């Protein structure tokens, strides 16, 4: 499976929602590295959505790392990326990746993480609706 091999090549952290202690440890480690300038990709849905170009609810807790690190949040809209993994084909597949306007700490510092999650979700959802050609 391609994604599994890609994840082996990069340092990635998987949250085990059933193990709170391990999750807190990962949050602390990633926050420390983010404060030091390392960039991370975080999937705030907590799991993969199998519906074409639709999103699940974002988990507010996934934004705790950015708030603790006072880091900018760059929403990214993935359109048709499911085709790469779900079509079981080696044919050329077109997908879209849209990097949206960063949300800086000063803009979200007084917001609750659930509100940040909704803001980011809504921005990505709007981009998908505007650009989804399917």
Question: Which residues does each predicted region cover?
Answer:
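Non-catalytic C-terminal accessory region of glycerolipid acyltransferases
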Residues: 24-134
């Amino acid at each position: 499976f391609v994604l599994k091999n890609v994840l082996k090549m990069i340092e990635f952290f998987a949250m085990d929602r059933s193990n709170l202690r391990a999750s807190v440890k990962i949050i602390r480690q990633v926050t420390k590295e983010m404060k030091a300038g390392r960039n991370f990709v975080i999937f705030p849905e907590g799991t993969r959505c199998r519906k074409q170009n639709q999103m699940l609810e974002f988990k507010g807790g996934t934004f705790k790392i950015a708030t603790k690190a006072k880091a900018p949040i760059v929403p990214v809209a993935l359109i048709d990326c499911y085709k790469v993994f779900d079509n079981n084909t080696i044919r050329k597949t077109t997908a879209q990746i849209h990097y949206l306007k960063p949300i800086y700490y000063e803009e979200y510092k007084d917001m609750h993480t659930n509100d940040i999650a909704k803001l980011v979700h809504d921005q990505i959802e709007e981009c998908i609706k505007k650009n989804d050609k399917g």
